[in-house]
Every structure is written in structure tokens, then in C-alpha cells.
């Protein structure tokens, strides 16, 4: 099987390959009520903001569909089909996927889910085709795309991609950034950003990943500020933010991104679990568990009075792949668990 070369993700090289929350912070964060089963129930009080919308039902999922050119034996084609068919994948307003890197597998997943989600964006950084606008540091010569795409039950009125300038380690070689989509949700203009921030990577210098993530969140905030979106319209940010909910970087993440914390965080303790998840356990033995995936509302825009993020611990039917005459069996569809907000 492919060995874990670098942690969790794959930024653009230069033009060629050579070369605050309105000061919003959680007012009270209850310690996670952590049972032996790994379930959590964290409750957060949020500061006042326009409360005018019902919660949007959003699924965010890092699907670990790495390019088969680099990782040929991770069952990408099987997992793409199984993800689209999984019960947890059904019935949402919006789905945001990360690490949809493999072209064929990601295209197959989107196609298979098209009855449930008839509207979708292209994958960030794969090309400029299909977007209403491209901004940031997109480069057609970057080896890998950004892996983020958005699927929707509701019509997409506008779709833009933004490619981050800042990156380190393996992320430097991908067009990572964010998708910005404007949806018509029962007549309400709803803005959704899907993203995958800088991974913690041994190829980065000490402290650099957190610095890069802060710069990426600031770039996203500046982009959204420039849109002059009315405060009455909700703005959501969903994705693998690579910031541990249980860690010290979490308050800074909220402030840098102008994000309001969810009212509660429930379900499994960690969305990235190297002991409970069979793929994560194989790829990252002994590494710490982390809670990295979120659906959050912008702090100074309309948002629900109460909504939660639920880490959905899902194990699949076992599937087997072979490499160099040896078989490997897993019972998960990704090295992350999905997070559902609503």
C-alpha cells in the first residue's frame, strides 16, 4: 500500500513550477462531555447577530480521493461510488467535499450523486472552465488541483474559485483555495464557501502551518468583505480547516475568519481519528487524534439562533485492495469522518 509520505493533504508554485470575528470569540465553551464511546457534546454561547434564517443542512467531508497517479491502491473508484450511495450522504441542502483530487473518481462521485444534488461547481484549481470568476494565485502549471467541490440541492446562481497564495510543504504543489457559491434557497440568497486549509506537514518549518492557515483565513475574509454581502444574507464556511477544535488555535481561527462558533459540537470526539478509523490508523499510526472539520456561519451576517456540528462516525462494509501480492482490508470510506450541520 502507499506509505504516508506527508500528512493529510496535498500550493501552487509560482507562475512556473521552478521558481475579528467582530472580535467574536466563544463566550463559554463547555468542556467536551467525553464518554468512553468517544462521543462528545460541546456547547458554545455565541454573541448577538442578525438571527433571521433557519439552519442550512450541510455535509462537509474530506473524501481522501488522492490522485491514482500517486496513490494507485486506495480504492478510489470503489470509494467514490460507495460515498455517493451512503446513507449519511443523502438529504442535505449542500455537500462540500475536500481531497476530491483524482479526476475520474471525483467526477464519478458527482455524477452518481446528481439525482440528489443536481447542481455542483467544478473542482477548485483543476482549470478555469465552468467558473464565473477565478481569483487569487491560480496557475495552470501547478501539478495538482485544490480538491474542493460543492454539490447542491438548490440552484447555484454564481460560482467562483479562489486559489491561496500562501502554502508550505506538499500543499505548495496544489491549487488549494476555496469555492464561493451563491445559492437560491427557497428565494433566500445564501452564500457558501467550501475550503481546505493548510495541512500540518513535516515539509513546513516549525509553526509555519498555523501561520499559513491564518493568512488563508484572512484572504478568505478579505474576499468576502469585498463582496459587500448584505448582513441579512447568511454566509457559511465549510470544510477541513485543519484546526483542532480541542486545541489552542481554534479561537484564532474564528477571529481570523470572522466566524461564529456553532452552538454545539456533538457526535464522535474527533473527525480525524487515528485509532478508530481504519484508513487513518494505517496511514498515521501513533499520530494524535484531531477534530478538524467544520460548518460555520460568518459572524456579522444572518445566521440561525442555534445550530450544531455533528461528527458522524461511519464505518462501511469492508473492502479490500491488493499491492505487491498482499491484501489490505478497510471498513471506512475516508481517513476523516463526515461532519453534518443543521
What are these regions, as identified by a protein language model?
Residues 50-54, 88-90, 112-115, 140-144, ...:
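Extracellular/periplasmic catalytic domains that process cell-envelope and extracellular macromolecules
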Residues 48, 175-182, 294, 329, ...:
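Short, surface-exposed beta-strand/loop micro-motifs that present aromatic residues
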Residues 79-83, 105-109, 147, 160, ...:
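Stable alpha-helical elements in mature extracytoplasmic
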Residues 3, 226-236, 243-342:
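Metal-dependent phosphoester-hydrolase catalytic domains
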Residues 68-70, 161-170, 197-213:
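Surface-exposed cleft-lining segments at the edges of enzyme active sites
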Residues 57-63, 83-107, 151, 181, ...:
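Active-site beta-strand/loop signature of hydrolases that rely on acidic residues for catalysis
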Residues 2-20, 26-115, 125-134, 140-145:
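N-terminal, active-site-proximal structural segment of metallo-dependent hydrolase catalytic domains
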Residues 94, 100-198:
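Structured beta-strand-rich core segments of catalytic domains in phosphoester-bond hydrolases
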Amino acid at each position: 500500500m502507499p506509505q504516508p509520505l506527508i500528512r493529510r493533504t496535498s500550493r501552487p508554485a509560482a507562475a512556473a513550477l521552478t521558481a475579528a470575528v467582530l472580535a467574536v470569540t466563544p463566550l463559554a465553551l463547555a468542556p467536551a462531555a467525553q464518554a468512553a464511546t468517544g462521543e462528545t457534546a460541546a456547547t458554545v454561547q455565541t454573541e448577538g447577530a442578525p438571527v433571521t434564517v433557519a439552519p442550512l443542512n450541510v455535509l462537509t467531508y474530506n473524501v481522501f480521493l488522492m490522485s491514482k497517479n500517486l496513490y494507485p491502491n486506495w480504492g478510489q473508484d470503489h470509494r467514490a461510488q460507495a460515498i455517493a450511495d451512503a446513507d449519511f450522504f443523502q438529504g442535505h441542502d449542500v455537500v462540500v467535499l475536500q481531497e476530491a483530487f483524482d479526476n475520474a473518481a471525483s467526477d464519478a462521485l458527482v455524477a452518481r450523486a446528481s439525482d440528489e444534488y443536481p447542481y455542483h461547481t467544478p473542482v477548485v484549481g483543476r482549470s478555469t472552465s465552468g467558473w464565473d470568476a477565478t481569483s487569487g494565485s491560480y496557475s495552470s502549471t501547478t501539478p495538482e488541483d485544490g480538491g474542493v467541490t460543492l454539490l447542491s440541492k438548490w440552484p447555484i446562481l454564481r460560482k467562483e474559485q479562489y486559489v491561496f497564495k500562501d502554502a508550505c510543504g506538499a500543499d505548495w504543489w496544489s491549487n488549494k483555495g476555496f469555492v464561493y457559491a451563491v445559492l437560491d434557497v427557497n428565494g433566500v440568497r445564501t452564500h457558501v464557501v467550501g475550503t481546505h486549509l493548510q495541512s500540518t506537514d513535516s515539509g513546513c518549518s516549525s509553526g509555519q502551518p498555523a501561520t499559513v492557515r491564518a493568512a488563508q483565513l484572512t484572504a478568505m475574509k478579505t474576499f468576502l468583505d469585498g463582496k459587500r454581502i448584505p448582513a441579512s444574507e447568511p454566509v457559511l464556511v465549510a470544510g477541513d480547516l485543519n484546526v483542532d477544535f480541542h486545541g489552542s488555535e481554534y479561537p484564532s481561527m474564528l477571529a481570523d475568519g470572522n466566524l461564529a462558533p456553532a452552538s454545539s459540537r456533538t457526535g464522535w470526539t474527533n473527525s480525524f481519528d487515528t485509532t478508530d478509523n481504519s484508513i487513518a490508523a494505517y496511514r498515521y499510526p501513533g499520530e494524535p487524534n484531531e477534530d478538524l472539520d467544520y460548518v460555520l456561519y460568518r459572524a456579522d451576517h444572518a445566521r440561525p439562533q442555534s445550530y450544531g456540528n455533528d461528527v458522524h462516525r461511519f464505518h462501511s462494509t469492508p473492502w479490500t485492495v491488493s499491492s505487491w501480492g498482499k491484501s489490505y482490508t478497510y471498513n471506512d470510506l475516508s481517513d476523516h469522518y463526515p461532519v453534518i450541520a443543521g
